Amino acid sequence: MKNFVLFVICAVMLSSCTTLTRQEHNQLRELQAQGVTVDRPVGNYEKPASGVAAGALNLLPGIGNFYLGTGNAAESSHVLYGVLNLLTWPLSILWAVPEAAIDADNINKRELIYYYTYDKQGKQELKDANIKLSHHKAEEQTHAFEESF
């Protein structure tokens, strides 16, 4: 029974990584093709999560996950991962430190996409930098089509 519980806990921990969807990967590639990355943004975008801080905080029982679950661009599922890491500490250090660093990077990528896709200021910064994304072009065409009626 003890091995089964340990297996379930490990399976939950290994599946707890934050991932990007295919659409988010495509949008990220499009931004990167225009020279916009998490490390080299256009305008005032700031990374909401630090991978180094999240990883270092997870040396303590689950604190890095609580940081990712409650800070800017919070993903609430990380609070649960933090509780599970707390319950399995000190063993959880083995997976929690790299998991938190990777998840912080993915959260930053997701927020970069959101900022330049939906945020008014982010859209304006792309426009000022003369960068057009394909989904913005489609929106402009739809808007022009609607105005013609």
Tell me what each language-model feature is.
Residues 5-8, 67, 146:
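Compositionally biased, low-structure terminal segments
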Residues 17-55, 76-149:
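Transmembrane helix recognition focused on a "late"/terminal membrane span
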Residues 62-63:
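Alpha-helical transmembrane segments of multipass membrane proteins
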Residues 66-75:
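Extended, hydrophobic alpha-helical membrane-active domains that insert into or remodel lipid bilayers
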